[in-house]
């Protein structure tokens, strides 16, 4: 895994992708830091971090689109799979390399509260706790990007899928309001999601038996639960969407 990590980290540090990612994150951070702290004199660095969470919508797809998709396109994934490193080790090595690239601008951002302390009182505890939450939020977004890069050999498709899903997570509060909270509508929605999951599994492993079994078992379990106790489905969509609302988790960090 260490060899994969070093190889991937070197590839990003010797190309424009890694530097473009870091530049964009620091550019947005600088703009909001100037607006909130330097111009408006807000004493809380958390305002800047909370305002710039949208940066992941653009920066993460750029960073992650090639990490595994390029391997599949160039057919070099076969070399990786025949290496003594496990599949989980390959994925983890690549993921940690991306997180390391992301950690570089985070280290730079860690100096901002120190700069603020020269001009007034700064709550370092809350500032660095917010920075930790921002780092974890970005790491979660990067994991999503790695997943979509793994299921396609097209960098463009991987980037688009990552953007769409991150945008959906970003707008989760608004999306949840469009769904009914009734048990029936929730059950039907979950049934559709199970079918979609089965199709995704089939597209990845090309095994109709396994994907079909997942679909049948999931749908049967859904019907049984609805018949036995339908009340558990009330407001279920909103509860599930809240779990995937990454931005709200950061705001409450």
Where are these regions (language model features)?
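Hydrophobic alpha-helical transmembrane segments
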Residues: 1-70, 204-205, 225-235
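Helix-loop-helix units of permease transmembrane domains in multi-pass membrane transporters
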Residues: 67-97
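Secretory targeting signals
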Residues: 29-36, 40-46, 50-55, 97-162, ...
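Alpha-helical membrane-protein architecture signal
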Residues: 2-6, 88, 92-96, 124-128
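Short amphipathic alpha-helical coupling elements at transmembrane boundaries
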Residues: 3, 7-11, 78-82, 150, ...
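Select subsegments of transmembrane alpha-helices in polytopic membrane proteins
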Residues: 17-22, 97-103, 186
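Terminal transmembrane helical anchor/hairpin motif
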Residues: 42, 151, 158-161, 165-253
């Amino acid at each position: 895994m260490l060899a994969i990590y070093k190889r991937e980290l070197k590839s990003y540090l010797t190309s424009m992708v890694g530097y473009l990612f870091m530049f964009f994150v620091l550019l947005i951070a600088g703009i909001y830091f100037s607006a909130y702290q330097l111009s408006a004199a807000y004493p809380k660095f958390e305002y800047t971090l909370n305002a710039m969470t949208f940066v992941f919508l653009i920066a993460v797809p750029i960073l992650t689109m090639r990490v595994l998709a390029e391997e599949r396109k160039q057919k070099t994934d076969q070399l990786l799979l025949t290496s003594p490193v496990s599949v989980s080790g390959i994925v983890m090595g690549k993921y940690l390399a991306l997180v390391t690239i992301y950690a570089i601008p985070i280290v730079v951002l860690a100096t901002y509260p120190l700069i603020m302390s020269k001009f007034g009182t700064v709550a370092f505890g809350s500032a660095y706790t917010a920075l930790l939450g921002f780092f974890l939020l970005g790491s979660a977004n990067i994991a999503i990007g790695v997943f979509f890069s793994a299921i396609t050999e097209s960098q463009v498709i991987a980037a688009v899928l990552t953007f769409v899903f991150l945008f959906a997570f970003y707008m989760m509060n608004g999306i949840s309001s469009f769904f009914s909270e009734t048990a029936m509508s929730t059950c039907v929605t979950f049934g559709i999601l199970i079918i979609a999951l089965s199709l995704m599994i089939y597209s990845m492993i090309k095994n109709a038996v396994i994907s079909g079994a997942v679909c049948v078992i999931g749908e049967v379990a859904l019907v049984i639960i609805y018949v036995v106790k339908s009340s558990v489905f009330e407001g279920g969509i909103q509860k599930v969407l809240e779990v995937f609302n990454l931005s709200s988790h950061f705001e409450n960090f």
